[in-house]
From Swiss-Prot:
Location in the cell: Cytoplasm
GO molecular function: ATP binding; magnesium ion binding; shikimate kinase activity
PROSITE patterns: SHIKIMATE_KINASE
Cofactor: Mg(2+)
Task of the protein: Catalyzes the specific phosphorylation of the 3-hydroxyl group of shikimic acid using ATP as a cosubstrate.
Binding site for Mg(2+): S20
UniProt KW keywords: Amino-acid biosynthesis, Aromatic amino acid biosynthesis, ATP-binding, Cytoplasm, Kinase, Magnesium, Metal-binding, Nucleotide-binding, Transferase
GO CC, alphabetical: cytosol
Protein name: Shikimate kinase
Encoding gene (name): aroK
Cofactor binding comment, as recorded: Binds 1 Mg(2+) ion per subunit.
Catalytic activity, EC: 2.7.1.71
Organism (species): Legionella pneumophila subsp. pneumophila (strain Philadelphia 1 / ATCC 33152 / DSM 7513)
Taxonomic placement: Bacteria, Pseudomonadati, Pseudomonadota, Gammaproteobacteria, Legionellales
Disulfide bridge positions per record: none
């Protein structure tokens, strides 16, 4: 049985949706290469994302992200976990939409809050009102996620394996 709907799998969604964890499991199961765009950006910069935001601002980070997304989406047979804000740049949306299957991993605000509340490595979440910030980011980005996605999957209350299996069933045309 071959995967007919995909040459690349791109995971989008908010911080804390499970893109990196599910992406690794999916790549392993499908025997594809896995990339996390944020990790690639950090490797190339020799610094973590918080440092990039501190020194270059969000604009500098988004420039780096755009370059990495353009490069990675030109590869074949990969699973790519993207950063939560990847969708705000039109060039990123075009690259993702034109070069693979875009899967939106959805999660509730409550689940997102639980998964990110102790995370000090996410510069956009360093705020007193984390829930308010998550809601604001959702309101800004969700229309882009919905528009860009070929399909979406809920991640709340499901194991990593269950979500990965649901995605695989979709890719094989079993859903």
């Amino acid at each position: 049985m071959s995967i007919v709907k995909v040459r690349n799998i791109f995971l989008i969604g908010p911080m804390g949706a499970g893109k990196s964890t599910i992406g690794r499991a999916l790549a392993k199961e499908l025997k594809l290469e896995f990339y996390d765009s944020d990790e690639v950006i950090e490797e190339r910069a020799g610094a973590d994302i918080s440092w990039i935001f501190d020194i270059e601002g969000e604009e500098g980070f988004r420039r780096r992200e755009q370059k990495v997304i353009d490069e990675l989406t030109q590869k074949t047979n990969i699973v790519l976990a993207t950063g939560g804000g990847v969708v705000i740049t039109p060039e990123n949306r075009n690259a993702l939409a034109g070069r693979g299957t875009v899967i939106y991993l959805k999660t509730s605000l409550q689940q997102q809050f639980e998964r990110t509340k102790r995370d000090t490595k996410r510069p956009l979440l360093q705020t007193e009102d984390l829930e308010g910030r998550l809601e604001s980011l959702r309101d800004e980005r969700e229309p882009f996620y919905d528009e860009l996605a070929d399909v979406s999957f809920e991640t709340d209350k499901l194991t990593v394996k269950a979500v990965a299996n649901n995605i695989i069933k979709y890719l094989y045309g079993e859903v």
